């Protein structure tokens, strides 16, 4: 927790305020459920969910001064749909989405809007760690109604919208950016 406090102290010292905090932490052990160990669970939950709670607290302390701010987390469709080898990450991202709702309610009186963006499969370096990478890519291309895979820009556009004044009354929501893929599951 000290590193989190140090990070936000540095933001405060440099800028004196915080308008938007993007929580894009993501890591996890990709194995079948029966092969998971306690250390895998703890590692993934700490990075993906626990960090949001404590970083969100520190971000909110800075945002309260201006009585405004946006906290936006990145999630994954694995939070609502089964993905092979994705147990720890999927469950941790479900925790991120739940925590998003709790933060949204408790931070609303301070003018802070909290939301999340959940993405479909994106071909990034992280995808190379999936043991079933090729099957995931094939599925994403062939079964996405929009006819193409999601790109990082698709997620960025959703985050930019949530960070804008146009989204001030959106609170505690997870915006799904998947080209319609989860509609077919």
Predicted regions and their residues:
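Substrate-binding pocket helix/loop in short-chain dehydrogenase/reductase
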Residues: 4, 32-33, 40-43, 137-140
């Amino acid at each position: 927790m000290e590193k989190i406090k140090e990070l936000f102290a540095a933001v405060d010292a440099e800028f004196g305020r915080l308008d938007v905090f993007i929580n894009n932490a993501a890591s996890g052990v990709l194995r079948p459920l029966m092969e998971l160990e306690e250390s895998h669970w703890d590692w993934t939950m700490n990075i993906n969910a626990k960090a949001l709670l404590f970083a969100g607290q520190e971000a909110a302390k800075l945002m309260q001064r201006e009585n405004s701010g946006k906290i936006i987390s990145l999630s994954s469709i694995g939070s609502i749909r089964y993905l092979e080898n994705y147990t720890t990450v999927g469950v941790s991202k479900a925790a991120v989405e739940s925590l998003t709702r709790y933060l949204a309610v408790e931070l609303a009186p301070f003018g802070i809007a909290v939301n999340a963006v959940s993405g479909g499969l994106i071909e990034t370096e992280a995808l190379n760690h999936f043991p079933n990478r090729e099957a995931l890519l094939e599925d994403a291309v062939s079964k996405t109604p929009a006819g193409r895979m999601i790109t990082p820009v698709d997620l960025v556009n959703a985050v930019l919208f949530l960070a804008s004044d146009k989204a001030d009354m959106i609170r505690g929501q997870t915006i799904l950016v998947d080209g319609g893929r989860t509609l077919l599951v």
